[in-house]
Amino acid sequence: MIYNCNFTVDQSNRELTRHGTTAFPIACYLDDLSQAHVCWHWHEEWEAGVVMEGEAILSIGAQTCTVSAGNGFLVNSGVLHSYQAKGDARCRLHVLVFHPRLVGGSMESVFYQKYVLPIAENRSMEGFFFHKDIPWQADAMAHILHAFQTCEQEPPYYELHVRNALSDFLALLLTHTSGVQAKGNAKELRDTERVKQLLSF
C-alpha cells in the first residue's frame, strides 16, 4: 500500500507516525513536494527515496543538495532531514521508510551486527545522495524502486521480495561506502546536534 506524506512530530521533532507494522516495519510514500514541503523531522527508521519528477532540495543533517529526477537519497537512523521542491514545477518522490530490523532481523543476528550496525550507528554517515550516472548508485536506486513497486502491487510473497531488494540495496551501499564510513566530520556532527536542539525549543 502507498501512502501520502502526512505526519506529526513531538517537541524534539521526532516523527510520531508508525511506519508499517511490528511484523513488517516498512511504509511507502508518494511525496508531492509541489503541494507541501516536508518539514524538519527525524525517526529511527532508514529513509530511502528517488525523485521521480522535477527537482527537490533535500537537507539531510548538515548536507543540502538539489536532487533532480532519476536521482535518489538515503537518510540514516536518527538524522534530521527536510525536503522541498525547487521552484514552482511539480516535484514527486517515491520514498521508503523502513526499520533496519526489516533487513537485519534481531539485534543479535549476524545480519544486524555485521551489516546494519556499521551504517545505523555511524554518525559520520548522516545520509547519502545517489546519482543515476554512477552505475552502482543506479543499481541501488533500482532496488529502492523495486521494493516500492512490490509494496504497491503486493504480489504473492511480496514481503520476501521487498526484504530481498532492501538487502541487495544494503549490500551495494556497504560495498561502495567503506571510505565514507571511515571518515568523520566533527563540525558537521556538531552542527546537526545544534540544529536538533534549536528545533526542540
Model-derived features: positions:
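Short, Lys/Arg-enriched, Trp-marked, Pro/Gly-tolerant hinge/linker segments that flank
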Residues: 126-137, 151-201
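A hydrophobic/aromatic-rich effector-binding and dimerization subdomain
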Residues: 2-25, 80, 84-148, 179
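Amphipathic, well-ordered alpha-helical segments in soluble domains
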Residues: 47-50, 139-143, 165, 172
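Loop/helix-junction capping segments adjacent to catalytic residues or to phosphate/diphosphate-binding pockets
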Residues: 67, 106, 156
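Short acidic, gly/pro-rich beta-turn/loop elements at beta-sheet edges
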Residues: 38, 58, 105-106, 181
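Generic protein-terminus/edge-of-domain signal
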Residues: 1-72, 79, 113-114, 124-128
